[in-house]
């Protein structure tokens, strides 16, 4: 699930988890009404990891994960050797074995999030509900966390329903995307390739600044405005770091000549005052070369990110020569 803050993503998850009563309609799991599933039967079907902190006194991380087995233990809550094997496997899957004997209350937020996922996996549910599960994780554990979820959906047929703010992650990992808008209603539901278009994402989140690149799922900040001071000769991925450095410095720039399928093009389109772009696999027209020279003449200096130019890139090689002769390179 994706959508702006306050749209109702957490409300949907809490309704599915029976923490909130739906105002209308019926939630069904495998055709059975959620109202008819209670207690341990529900806990064996569904596990939940929400953003609210749990307060545990004098519990080790293993103790917390072991609570995921209680739907299977009966009235006395005694874990068998088989239960502990499930606990150990769940902790191994999310890489928290080394935290086994540590006090749960004293570990970091990121570690706590991983322990809570291990607890949910120890329940061996059919459905796993997650509310912004990667909020406290660094990039290493974020990738490992999502990889584990993906493996569980494939190998154990686990259904995962989660809210995510990282659009690039949602685009890469999800089979289906549910979009909840500012009107607290479902706006769209479908495959990521149908949802993640620049125009729709801007509308969904009410973006008035910056840009969304549908190819990478990444956001770009607003580019600097005003008279261009720098002309950048880029291409083949050599220009992106320069574009962003100029943006951070607040320096307006022009770039070209870029093919529209070049990896530099989306970043240039988002940040540059002007992009001189040519159609892919076509020879650059002479009028575009003249246009690039005119922009060069207006700029104070030229940055060339390229060292080598191929057969199809003679136009940019000529621009570098022109910049040198003009004393701007």
For each predicted feature, which ranges?
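Helix-to-loop junction immediately C-terminal to a conserved catalytic motif
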Residues: 17
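Catalytic Walker B motif of ABC-type/P-loop ATPase nucleotide-binding domains
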Residues: 128-132
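Conserved switch/coupling elements of ABC/ABC-like ATPase nucleotide-binding domains
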Residues: 33, 178, 182-194
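Conserved ABC transporter NBD signature motif
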Residues: 25-33, 42
